[in-house]
């Protein structure tokens, strides 16, 4: 929004031209989202406590989690508010990339809100029925996938980028829709599964978003894109604003979500942030890179699939409890140790993913 005001004011003072630079607006976007989260966080936590919107803890969960019962949840609203305000202020509202991301965050945030509302307000421990949650996620993801395919303006927007391969970028055609759908829905649910310990999901989300900010910037510059053999995507630089807003809002939220957490993000946060990461990966044509950089999310999801599959087929469990972070808790690891080690793994995988841009 302020881009247009700065463009108008440039005729009176050329210094306002600095707002035309994505990097400058990205920094302001990060700071805006972070300051908003830090400023509004205590007020929101107090409000959630007054409304008695507290975390529901399953009786079959680890005993150490019983103390978390009643901790304010739905803190993802704080993250979403910070991201929306930041992007609307510093993003180019004429960019389809910006509106796609706002739609995804809003749609999946609404799904998560309904789920959280049923759990904490209506005291339904199951929340939104899994079937309906999946249907709503699918409708939102398919809407985005069809739109992106129909509005693609270049071949690069529907190519598949393979890490480690320089000149292998097959054209997906209509299969783009299928890949986009599974990437968005899968990423949304993967982050949701990871969000089981204090700060466990938000920090890897911040790391992956920061990495995608760099990739989006490189993809939006023809020289960098050609040098790295990745698709040149005109206008994708505006995704940098969205990514840095997620980083800023996420770090601000982590201030209150770090162990012992004062607030949890809830499904309103985890489903929307996961979908956002998946959508960004689709937009910059780096779905496979998301699997690498978001390896912690993949690990958590695979542990659940293996656990359920093993129990149904063999009647035996592989892990003491799934997702896998609970397995390590039940092995006796203190919660902070599990969290920080998963963060370290995430940092390693993000750096590995970025390295693949050059290892071709």
Curated annotation (Swiss-Prot):
It catalyses: UDP-N-acetyl-alpha-D-muramoyl-L-alanyl-gamma-D-glutamyl-meso-2,6-diaminopimeloyl-D-alanyl-D-alanine + di-trans,octa-cis-undecaprenyl phosphate = di-trans,octa-cis-undecaprenyl diphospho-N-acetyl-alpha-D-muramoyl-L-alanyl-D-glutamyl-meso-2,6-diaminopimeloyl-D-alanyl-D-alanine + UMP. Pfam families: Glycos_transf_4, MraY_sig1. It comes from the Bacteria. Pathway: Cell wall biogenesis; peptidoglycan biosynthesis. It is found in: Cell inner membrane. The keyword Cell membrane applies. The chain crosses the membrane at residues 21-41, 74-94, 97-117, 134-154, 168-188, 199-219, 236-256, 263-283, 288-308, 338-358. Its EC number is 2.7.8.13. Its main location: membrane. One of its GO terms (molecular function) is metal ion binding. GO terms for biological process: cell division; cell wall organization; peptidoglycan biosynthetic process; regulation of cell shape. It is a multi-pass membrane protein. Keywords: Cell cycle, Cell division, Cell inner membrane, Cell membrane, Cell shape, Cell wall biogenesis/degradation, Magnesium, Membrane, Metal-binding, Peptidoglycan synthesis, Transferase, Transmembrane, Transmembrane helix. Its cofactor is Mg(2+). The keyword Cell division applies. GO terms for cellular component: plasma membrane. Belongs to the glycosyltransferase 4 family. MraY subfamily. Catalyzes the initial step of the lipid cycle reactions in the biosynthesis of the cell wall peptidoglycan: transfers peptidoglycan precursor phospho-MurNAc-pentapeptide from UDP-MurNAc-pentapeptide onto the lipid carrier undecaprenyl phosphate, yielding undecaprenyl-pyrophosphoryl-MurNAc-pentapeptide, known as lipid I. This is Phospho-N-acetylmuramoyl-pentapeptide-transferase. The gene is mraY.
């Amino acid at each position: 929004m302020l881009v247009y005001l700065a463009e108008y004011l440039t005729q009176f003072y050329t210094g306002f031209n600095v707002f035309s630079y994505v990097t400058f607006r990205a920094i302001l976007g990060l700071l805006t989202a972070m300051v908003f989260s830090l400023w509004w966080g205590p007020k929101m936590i107090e409000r959630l406590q007054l409304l008695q919107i507290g975390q529901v803890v399953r009786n079959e969960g680890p005993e150490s989690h019983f103390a978390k019962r009643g901790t304010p949840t739905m803190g993802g609203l704080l993250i979403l508010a910070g991201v929306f305000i930041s992007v609307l202020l510093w993003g180019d509202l004429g960019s389809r990339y910006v509106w796609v991301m706002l739609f995804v965050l809003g749609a999946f945030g609404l799904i998560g809100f309904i789920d959280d509302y049923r759990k904490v307000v209506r005291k339904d421990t199951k929340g939104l029925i899994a079937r309906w949650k999946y249907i709503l996620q699918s409708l939102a993801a398919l809407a985005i996938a069809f739109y992106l395919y129909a509005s693609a303006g270049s071949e690069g927007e529907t190519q598949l980028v393979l890490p480690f391969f320089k000149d292998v970028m097959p054209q997906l055609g209509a299969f783009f829709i299928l890949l986009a759908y599974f990437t968005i829905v899968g990423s949304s649910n993967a982050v949701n599964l990871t969000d089981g310990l204090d700060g466990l999901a938000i920090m890897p989300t911040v790391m992956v978003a920061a990495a995608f900010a760099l990739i989006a910037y490189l993809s939006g510059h023809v020289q960098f894109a050609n040098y790295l053999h990745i698709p040149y995507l005109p206008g994708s630089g505006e995704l940098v604003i969205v990514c840095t807003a997620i980083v800023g809002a996420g770090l601000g939220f982590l201030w209150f979500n770090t162990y012992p957490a004062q607030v949890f993000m809830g499904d309103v946060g985890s489903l929307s942030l996961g979908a956002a990461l998946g959508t960004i990966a689709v937009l910059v044509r780096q779905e496979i890179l998301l699997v690498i950089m978001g390896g912690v999310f993949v690990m958590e999801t695979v542990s659940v699939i293996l656990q359920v599959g093993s129990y149904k087929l063999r009647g035996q469990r592989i892990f003491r409890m799934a997702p896998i972070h609970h397995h390590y808790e039940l092995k006796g690891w203190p919660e902070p140790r599990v969290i920080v080690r998963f963060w370290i793994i995430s940092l390693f995988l993000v750096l590995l993913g970025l390295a693949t841009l050059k290892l071709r």
